[in-house]
């Protein structure tokens, strides 16, 4: 915690090192060994630091148990099965609980499931519209607004990412919650890998997809299809991002 305080400050002295906008916490393993899953450690970070906390919300203990259920499987469907929506919801609920307990600013990264989006309907708002604390915001990726299990079945590990591409029902609820304002922003979680690395197949292939260069064209396609307006895209990818 001391290193984090030096980087982002404390409640009493909220001065961050220039260029550091906050703390990202992996509540479940995704990239390398980056992980803070212990509730006591998480509460210390929420209590003793300043600035924004952004969380990759997957419950590590549940994920570890469910990983045992797919031992020996090489089909890509196993990825979303063991990193399921309850795994994500548990971590999202914990982060919201800690934000309410401490009053800390919270941003929940790359929302993927319908049950999370519905749960956050009562918790998220733009900072400029907030009436008190905590201020909680969230985001969604074009990948999760576009793909579902049929695409994963067709394209395999090229669509493998964490948290995973889920199901058509999740995609539709994410759209609903983006339009109604529960979700404030469009992000990308840009994490490209070579085709050589992806060719290893599941579960050895790395998780991650490109996103920066495709995000705006994908969203403009939705404008052309009538799913949203250009003003919506401007809010989700520009003004709301600045607000957050």
Positions of predicted regions on the chain:
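Histidine/acidic residue-rich metal-binding segments in metalloenzymes
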Residues: 2-186
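His/Asp/Glu-enriched, well-ordered alpha-helical/loop segment
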Residues: 74-103, 158, 179-180, 185-186, ...
């Amino acid at each position: 915690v001391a290193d984090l305080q030096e980087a982002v400050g404390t409640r009493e002295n909220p001065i961050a090192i220039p260029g550091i906008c906050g703390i990202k916490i992996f509540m479940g393993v995704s990239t390398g060994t980056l992980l803070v899953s212990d509730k006591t450690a998480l509460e210390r970070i929420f209590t003793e630091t300043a600035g924004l906390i952004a969380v990759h919300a997957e419950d590590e203990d549940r994920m570890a148990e469910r990983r045992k259920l797919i031992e020996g499987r090489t089909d890509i469907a196993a990825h979303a099965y063991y990193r399921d929506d309850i795994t994500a919801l548990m971590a999202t609920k914990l982060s919201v609980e800690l934000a309410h307990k401490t009053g800390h600013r919270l941003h929940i990264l790359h929302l993927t499931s319908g049950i999370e989006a519905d749960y956050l309907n009562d918790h998220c708002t733009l900072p400029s519209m907030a009436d008190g604390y905590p201020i909680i915001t969230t985001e969604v990726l074009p990948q999760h607004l576009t793909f579902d299990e049929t695409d994963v079945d067709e394209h395999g590990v090229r669509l493998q990412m964490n948290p995973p591409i889920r199901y058509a029902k999740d995609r539709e609820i994410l759209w609903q919650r983006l339009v109604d304002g529960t979700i404030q922003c469009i992000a990308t979680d840009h994490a490209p890998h070579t085709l050589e690395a992806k060719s290893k197949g599941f579960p050895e292939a790395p998780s991650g997809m490109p996103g920066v260069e495709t995000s705006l064209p994908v969203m403009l396609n939705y404008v052309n299809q009538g799913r949203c307006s250009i003003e919506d895209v401007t809010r989700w990818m520009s003004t709301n991002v600045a607000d957050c």
